[in-house]
């Protein structure tokens, strides 16, 4: 569910069609050129057939309602967060009325089926490249993964490899030093009988009576206890190249996203978009953030975020983000059923 300020929505109803076109034109032009927009420029780049004086009066009303502001006397206008929100909502309406854009994401259709890490890496880098933003993708929680197979592979008289293969192709491997000769094939068969189809979380909670107090339960705990970064990221260089952001802005962002509760607060149902002050952190007011979840069937298994300057292509970015989320959900749903 998109986070929408009802006051903004109600205020936009006070605008007539011409004023909405003027506002749309100002925001689009500012996003394209990063320069204040004059009434003359509005007439040059639009099909609005009114005088410059009429457009100036419309701009005064838009300024009064908080959609645009004038940085100094005699300058053109710059959209506020409220104006950017109007533009984003208008673009959503337009996109629903037109056919879906042909996005340059064909490479994502050939993603590898056996390696979820590569899929997430590809999705993150593709999203960062196409949106020119900074992307965070949350990996699925290891404890929620079902065990597909346990393997015990002798490599010498004193060592064997203990391996757990889970859904999505995620595996954990550790060497074991053995002090006695046992029938490892039979032990592997018994472990698979006990564990196959169970989640790692169920095993660690001690729900498998036969494993309680066993060395194998401790092995599983040590495997899952390995430090794995919760998020992978991509596209930080995009923010560094953005002329609307200062280095201090980027430092602030990197500091804020260390707060897990803050990240979780950004996610709603469907795709959430927060612009400038809507994010709720004063030091992030120059940013916009898109967030959403990807699923395995009906169950959410991870969140995706991308941060960009609030002066951005909302129409294109929304479509790209929606596409990536859908593709990730399709991949993890189909992989879990194999």
From Swiss-Prot:
The family database entries (Pfam families) matched by this protein are listed as: HrcA
Look up the domain of life of the source.
Answer: Bacteria
Q: One of this protein's GO BP terms?
A: negative regulation of DNA-templated transcription
Annotated keywords: Repressor, Stress response, Transcription, Transcription regulation
Coiled coil, from the record: none
Q: Recorded GO terms, molecular function? A: DNA binding
Checking NCBIfam families in the record gives:
hrcA (TIGR00331)
PANTHER family attached to this UniProt entry: HEAT-INDUCIBLE TRANSCRIPTION REPRESSOR HRCA (PTHR34824:SF1)
- Its family? Belongs to the HrcA family.
Say what the protein does.
Negative regulator of class I heat shock genes (grpE-dnaK-dnaJ and groELS operons). Prevents heat-shock induction of these operons.
Name this polypeptide is given: Heat-inducible transcription repressor HrcA
Q: Which organism is it from?
A: Thermotoga petrophila (strain ATCC BAA-488 / DSM 13995 / JCM 10881 / RKU-1)
């Amino acid at each position: 569910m998109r986070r929408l300020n009802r006051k903004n929505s109600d205020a936009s109803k006070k605008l007539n069609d011409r004023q909405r076109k003027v506002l749309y034109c100002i925001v689009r032009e500012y996003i394209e050129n990063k320069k204040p927009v004059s009434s003359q420029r509005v007439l040059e780049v639009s099909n609005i057939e009114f005088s410059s004086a009429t457009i100036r009066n419309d701009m005064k009303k838009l300024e009064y309602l908080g959609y645009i502001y004038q940085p100094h006397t005699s300058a053109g206008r710059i959209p506020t967060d409220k104006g950017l929100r109007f533009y984003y909502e208008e673009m959503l309406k337009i996109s629903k009325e037109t056919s879906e854009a042909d996005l340059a994401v064909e490479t994502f259709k050939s993603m590898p089926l056996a390696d979820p890490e590569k899929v997430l890496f590809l999705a993150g880098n593709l999203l960062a490249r196409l949106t020119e933003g900074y992307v965070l993708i949350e990996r699925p929680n290891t404890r929620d993964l079902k065990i597909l197979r346990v393997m015990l592979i002798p490599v010498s008289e004193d060592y064997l490899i203990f391996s757990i293969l889970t859904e999505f192709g995620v595996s954990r491997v550790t060497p074991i030093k053995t002090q006695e000769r046992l029938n490892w094939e039979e032990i592997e068969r018994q472990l698979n009988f006990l564990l196959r189809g169970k989640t790692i979380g169920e095993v660690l909670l001690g729900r498998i009576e036969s494993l309680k107090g066993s060395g194998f339960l401790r092995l599983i705990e040590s495997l899952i206890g390995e430090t794995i970064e919760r998020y992978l990221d991509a596209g930080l260089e995009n923010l560094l190249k953005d002329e609307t952001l200062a280095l201090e802005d980027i430092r602030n962002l990197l500091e804020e996203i260390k707060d897990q509760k803050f990240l979780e607060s950004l996610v709603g149902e469907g795709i959430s978009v927060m612009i400038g002050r809507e994010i709720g952190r004063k030091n992030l007011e120059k940013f916009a953030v898109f967030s959403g979840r990807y699923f395995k069937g009906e169950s959410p298994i991870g969140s995706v975020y991308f941060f960009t300057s609030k002066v951005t292509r909302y129409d294109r970015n929304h479509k790209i983000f929606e596409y990536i989320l859908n593709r990730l959900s399709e991949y993890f749903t189909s992989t879990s059923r194999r």
